[in-house]
């Protein structure tokens, strides 16, 4: 029997799903993170997981985004052959109208991150359209839809290899994961696609990430196929790398490994790998012609009773900070920042460097200040600023030396690790790099007491803001001597776990 899917039902269902995943983690993710928190032995990593879980509950209660990067929308549709759409526009246009409405919803405006003309103009589309949409035609009279929002930090760490038929997939994964740094915001998942062609392997990897986390169940009952054996082997060995939550070293780097495969040409073995971050966001629903889809929200009582103890953190007055005080900070120290910080990320840094190269004066005085790599969500209601978690710091590495040396900037705040060139620039300038927890954007935003755009307003969420913060939680990631916790801690925990020999990269 033919099923009629009405245009408004499709649009509203997509809109509702995008709002839903902006503030609700999937329940399986919450449970897996809770177990990771209970198991974790490294205090820094345990604190990071605690902040992610506390932020998750705050977002569920307040209906505000888990992460300021509310992602590029991925939509997977399985359309029954006996379905007829009652549309006045194309199916793509109807889905994108749902995206538009979802991101512009006045009660919970989501950050628009999608840029048109990617090679040249890179102009923000303002409503996060278009989505990346995939279709399958299947038997039946219903439409199954999966909606996901994929942030740049994890998506940018996607990997593809055209392996030889005899190459080891496990060896490739273990060689590749350390090169991804911590910008993908672990703990999360790795989706792995094996076979097909290059684009098929990547599609399989992305689709695998939509599956439910069930590694603990698999470990309890034991593997029942070679694929399950492979999942367990990769899971155990990746965690044995000791990368840990946010790259701080620890027992849990991945919560699960998901693998999908497809037949491939005899001459090769394509393998794609895509991580899902601590802001895992996806929802699944079905349209059967009866109206708008309903997605079951997790219950607040399902969230763990986790607290974050800040009593051992040092309070810092950024408006009166001295070089001597910064010299005393050690990697792993937790700080509570108070005072003035400026924001600036990719586009702002590019513009500042262009101005410096042209001999122009910058619109803000950064001498003795800290700059926070963030693109916040617009505020709603009485908020000072919307969710404002850190963006991946390595994208600013190429600007770091020039900005430090030209402005007298004291330090930077961002997400995850810094590359060798940035660490060297930090050391040479006796600066410092502080790390805020990725995936805890709403929690971080509560520390912002004042916010105003002070430069580059045309850049939208990439404008430079002046923030006044109160007890903003960060950790020292690179000290004035150039010692990086992301370089030292994983080696320590890899040795403690003891399953994989620690090899000094300098010896290779």
Locate each region found by the language model.
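Short, structured beta-strand/loop micro-motifs enriched in basic residues and often containing a Trp
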Residues: 311-321
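Generic structural signal for buried aliphatic residues
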Residues: 335-337, 341
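Feature captures the catalytic cores and cofactor-binding loops of soluble hydro-lyases/lyases
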Residues: 209, 213-242, 246-249, 343-475
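Short, well-ordered loop/turn sites that connect or cap secondary structure elements
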Residues: 328-329, 335
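Non-transmembrane, aqueous-exposed alpha-helical and coiled segments at domain scale
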Residues: 1-192, 197-309, 405
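Short, solvent-exposed amphipathic alpha-helical segments in soluble enzyme
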Residues: 163, 205-209, 272-276, 289-291, ...
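C-terminal binding/interaction regions
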Residues: 249-257, 264-265, 278, 446-508
């Amino acid at each position: 029997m033919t099923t009629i899917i009405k245009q408004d039902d499709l649009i509203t269902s997509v809109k509702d799903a995008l709002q839903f995943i902006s503030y609700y983690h999937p329940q399986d993710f919450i449970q897996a993170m809770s177990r990771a928190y209970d198991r974790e032995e490294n205090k820094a990593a345990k604190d990071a997981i605690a902040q992610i879980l506390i932020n998750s509950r705050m977002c569920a209660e307040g209906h505000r985004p888990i992460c300021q990067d509310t992602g590029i929308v991925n939509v997977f549709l399985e359309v029954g052959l006996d379905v007829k759409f009652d549309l006045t526009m194309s199916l793509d246009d109807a889905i994108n109208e749902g995206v538009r409405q979802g991101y512009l919803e006045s009660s919970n405006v989501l950050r628009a991150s999608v840029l048109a003309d990617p090679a040249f103009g890179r102009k923000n589309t303002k409503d996060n359209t278009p989505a990346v949409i995939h279709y399958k035609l299947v038997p039946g009279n219903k439409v199954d839809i999966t909606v996901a929002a994929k942030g740049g930090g994890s998506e940018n760490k996607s990997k593809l290899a055209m392996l030889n038929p005899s190459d080891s997939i496990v060896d490739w994964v273990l060689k590749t994961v350390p090169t991804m740094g911590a910008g993908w915001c672990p703990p999360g998942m790795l989706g792995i696609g094996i076979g097909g062609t290059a684009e098929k392997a990547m599609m399989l990897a992305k689709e695998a990430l939509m599956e439910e986390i069930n590694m603990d169940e698999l470990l309890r009952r034991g593997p029942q196929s070679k694929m399950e054996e492979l999942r367990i082997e990769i899971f155990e060995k990746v965690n044995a790398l000791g990368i840990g939550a946010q790259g701080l070293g620890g027992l849990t780097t991945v919560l699960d490994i998901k693998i999908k495969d497809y037949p491939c040409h005899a001459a090769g073995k394509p393998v794609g790998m895509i991580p899902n971050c601590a802001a895992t966001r996806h929802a699944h629903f079905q349209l059967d012609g009866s109206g708008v889809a309903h997605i079951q929200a997790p219950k607040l009582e399902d969230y763990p009773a986790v607290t974050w103890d800040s009593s051992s953190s040092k309070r810092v007055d950024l408006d009166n900070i001295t070089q001597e005080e910064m010299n005393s900070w050690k990697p792993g120290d937790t700080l509570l920042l108070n005072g003035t910080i400026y924001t600036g990320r990719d586009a702002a840094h590019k513009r500042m460097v262009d101005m410096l190269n042209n001999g122009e004066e910058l619109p803000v005085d950064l001498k003795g200040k800290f700059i926070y790599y963030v693109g916040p969500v617009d505020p709603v209601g009485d908020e000072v600023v919307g969710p404002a978690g850190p963006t991946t710091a390595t994208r600013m590495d190429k600007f770091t030396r020039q900005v430090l040396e030209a402005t007298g900037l004291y330090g930077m705040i961002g997400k995850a690790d810094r590359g060798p060139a940035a660490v060297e620039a930090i050391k040479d300038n006796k600066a410092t790099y502080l790390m805020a927890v990725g995936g805890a954007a709403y929690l971080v935003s509560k520390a912002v007491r004042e916010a105003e755009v002070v430069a580059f307003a045309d850049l939208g969420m990439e404008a430079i803001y002046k923030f006044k913060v109160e007890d903003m939680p960060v950790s020292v990631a690179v000290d004035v001597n150039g010692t990086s916790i992301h370089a030292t801690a994983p080696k320590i925990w890899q040795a403690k776990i003891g399953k994989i020999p620690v090899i000094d990269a300098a010896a290779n």
